[in-house]
Regions:
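Hydrophobic faces of well-ordered beta-strands that scaffold small-molecule active sites
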Residues: 1-2, 25-28, 48-54, 79-81, ...
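Conserved N-terminal beta1-alpha1 strand-loop-helix module at the mouth
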Residues: 1-50, 56-61, 73
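Glycine-rich beta-to-alpha transition loops that act as phosphate-gripper elements at the mouths
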Residues: 8, 52-63, 82-84, 103-109, ...
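Glycine-enriched alpha-helix->loop->beta-strand junction motifs that scaffold or abut catalytic
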Residues: 22-23, 46-49, 75-77, 97-100, ...
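Catalytic cores of alpha/beta
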Residues: 62-71, 110-118, 153-171
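Glycine-rich phosphate-binding active-site loops on the catalytic face of alpha/beta enzymes
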Residues: 74-86, 121-134, 164-185
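C-terminal helical cap(s) of enzyme catalytic domains, especially alpha/beta-barrels
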Residues: 91-92, 96, 138, 159-162, ...
Length: 196
């Protein structure tokens, strides 16, 4: 995207985690109505490209289009819509924006052909334990579509996602609380600060 090769994508909106990550990009999606102030905070913290969630599930219609425009104006590298987003909204986004429209795919029953026809430029595959299987099915029929996908919780699941054909893997970092727990446990034992 814009001459950048993106292989690792951090799934977080926590600015302290984002600032201390070496991922190639950030995907800023969250389970609430998207807000430009959150996008702004993430964009200011990140020194890498940011893909911004603009709704499609809880948030619908004209608001999604407005959030997409706003994200583009703020400098997002792409906008992400959730699986329930109608193809008509994907089409409107594609016509209105100059940045990639990334559509989340959660099941093999999703209308992949319709998504592409509407203007999806990248798929964000998030099918839990079936992610590698779904990637393979998409890749077989559409070998050239860029795919970012959830890597899962282990090195093995990440490797399976890559082997299935994902171009980039999203990774969920530990929370601040989890990191602090490890640090404080080490301090209580008078051990060195753990590395991350």
């Amino acid at each position: 995207i814009c001459g950048r090769r993106i292989k690792s994508v951090l799934f977080s909106t926590d600015v302290s985690i984002i600032r201390n990550s070496n991922a190639d990009a950030v995907i800023a999606v969250y389970p609430f109505t998207p807000q430009p102030v959150i996008t702004q905070a993430v964009m200011m913290a990140a020194d890498t490209p940011v893909f911004v969630g603009i709704g499609g599930g809880l948030t619908k219609g004209e608001r999604v289009l407005g959030l997409g425009r706003h994200a583009e104006y703020q400098g997002a590298f792409g906008v992400v819509v959730n699986a329930p987003t109608p193809n008509s909204t994907v089409k409107e986004l594609k016509e209105a924006l100059d940045i990639p429209v990334i559509v989340t795919v959660v099941s093999e029953e999703d209308d992949i052909a319709g998504r592409l026809e509407a203007g999806a430029e990248i798929f964000n595959v998030s099918a839990a334990s079936k992610t590698p299987e779904l990637i393979e099915k998409i890749r077989k029929k559409y070998p050239d579509i860029p795919i970012m996908a959830t890597g899962g919780p282990t090195d093995e699941t990440i490797k399976a996602t890559i082997a299935a054909g994902a171009n980039a893997v999203t990774w969920t970092p530990p929370t601040n609380g989890e990191v602090f727990k490890d640090i404080m446990d080490a301090y209580r034992k008078h051990q060195e600060h753990p590395t991350y």
